[in-house]
Structures are given as structure tokens and as C-alpha cells.
């Protein structure tokens, strides 16, 4: 399920098809590219794709991009390869079965896998590896974000062929945090599968609310205030609330 929270709609676009599938990758790219002047720093796609619904799709990164070119990295690629090997070892230890893996850039991967246990424990252990961040886990959701405009990101990750029922995306101009992948939108509702959040606006009392959630054991990966929404939702859902109930809380 996707959730868009907006102060205005200048940086967010979405596509929804009821009862049918469409090329949501290209549709979202066309809309987001028109917003390039609003958000030139990074672009993110949350695509609810036509996967088989049986297996999890995990998108993760082992480092950061430092420029629009997919080969622009801030560490030697051998470091990334080593982290990927550590992820593979951890997956074996956790009992996850990887059915398919794709290397998308020097720092990002897409895995199709079977896993039947607790996703929070799973995610914590994967992210205990230095500089590894899970961008999303879902049976439908695939969350892709990187530096560059919508077309740059679409081409880099070959999203033009992705079909699905709905999608939401964000073109970002960094104002409250750094220009990097971890601060880009959308944010995954860690560790709940198929939940993503995109937001436009500014949150007050970010640091106070962040400390409250961190004291409850919740995880933050960036200093972007919008991530707080995803973490807040996850904390409520962890304690038994439904996404629908939390979404309509005032």
C-alpha cells in the first residue's frame, strides 16, 4: 500500500489503475520528468509491480552514489562487492532462499527470495552490515531511488518495462538533509512489506519526535524529516494498529 502525504503536490505524482495493469514505470517517469525543475537532486519510484505474489522482492544498496552517473561512487567497488558477499552469507544464515539476483549499479541490487520468518529480525541483521540499507521488501512493492532526474533513474534501473497496478514517485530538491540516496523519497515502512511513504512539506519538532521513536527501538537511516512519517507508521503497526487506522488518525 502506498501513502502520499502532501503540503502541496509540486513534487509528487502517482498512477493508479483499478482492476488492470499498465506500464507504471513509463507513466510515472513522464509525470516526474515534467517536475524536474521542482526537484533536480534525486528521484524515487515506489512501483507496485506485477510480480507473482509468492516471493519477496528485496531492493537494497551497499553504498551511496555521489553523482548522476551510475559509475560515480565514493568507495572502491571491491568494498561494495565484499558487502554484497556479507549480505549473501547473512541470508543463508537466516534461512532465506535467493531465487534470482540482479546487480543494478555498483552499489544496488534486486533479489527475489523466499523467506517465512520475522521481517524485523531479518532486516535488522541484514542492516547490521556496514553501509547496507534495505530500500524495500515486498511481494508487490519495489522502491527505487537515486540521484538524478526521473529519466536518469528510469534508464539506470531499466524501469521502463515495469508493469503494475499503481505507483507513486517524488522529485526532490534537498532542503532539510543531504543529497544522497538514503534521504531521497519514497521511504519504506520498515519492516512492513509493501508499505511506502512519500511526503512534501516540512515537519515540525522532527528531532523531538525522532528521539521518542528511537527510544522505542525504531530505526532511522537518514536525517530527512519525511522519514519520520514512515517510522511513525511502522511503530504504530508494530503495536497492532492497521495502516488504514493510522492513516486516518488526526
Explain the meaning of each model-derived region:
Residues 1-7, 12, 250:
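Single conserved hydrophobic/aromatic residue that forms the stacking wall/gate
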Residues 8-75, 104-112, 117-143:
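Extreme N-terminus nucleophile/cap motif
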Residues 22, 52-54, 175-178, 204-206, ...:
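Flexible loop/turn segments at secondary-structure boundaries
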Residues 31, 141-196, 240-248:
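Conserved mixed alpha/beta core segments that line enzyme active sites in large multi-domain catalysts
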Residues 39, 193-209:
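Conserved beta-strand-loop-short alpha-helix elements that form
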Residues 57-58, 178-182, 207-211, 234:
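Short acidic, glycine/serine/threonine-rich loops at helix termini
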Residues 76-96:
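Short amphipathic alpha-helix segments
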Residues 204-248:
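Short histidine
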